[in-house]
Amino acid sequence: MGSTNVHCLCPPSAQSARATADDATILAAARQVASGVSVVTVGAGEERAGLMAVSVSLLSADPAALLVCVNRARPGYSAFARSRRFAVNVLGGDQREIAHHFTGFRDASDAWRFDIGRWLLLADGLSCLADCAAVFECETEETIERHANAIVIGWVRRAVIGGASGALVRWRGAYDQLGWSRDEISRAVGLRPSGEAQDGC
């Protein structure tokens, strides 16, 4: 029988870099991956909690399921782990302040994180962010805890497309806007953005 030849498509320099990469190099390389920004919320009222997702992706279209990765050290994770239902709020391009509000570890309480933004109550009791790019209402099927994170498979029970014109993305450790906001579109076509006073007002 003939032998099987295995060819590596990486140049020698890439193979060497992969073999000797240190933690700093790995993290720097990971920061080159642009990704959407989502806030995961559970509960309502005084029981509501939220945390920034490390990543969100579509696991399956039929049946509809998301793969949601969250940091287990975040203050909101304990409430998230106790709840079987959660909402994934995909942030729009003009919601950078909300992203900063849900990032960090500084407080064990989550109440203050909901002080900005307009929050709505869904039929099943979940809090969701108005005017975001999209909202997925999910039910946890399985949670896999690995290292610092929890990998959650969530069945999508309902999805809503929001009114955001652009998307918020994370790249190289910073947030940026992809696409134009409604106000930028208004200015481009010579209209006054919403919220700006008209002449004579």
Named regions from a protein language model:
Residues 2-201:
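Basic, polyanion-binding surface patches
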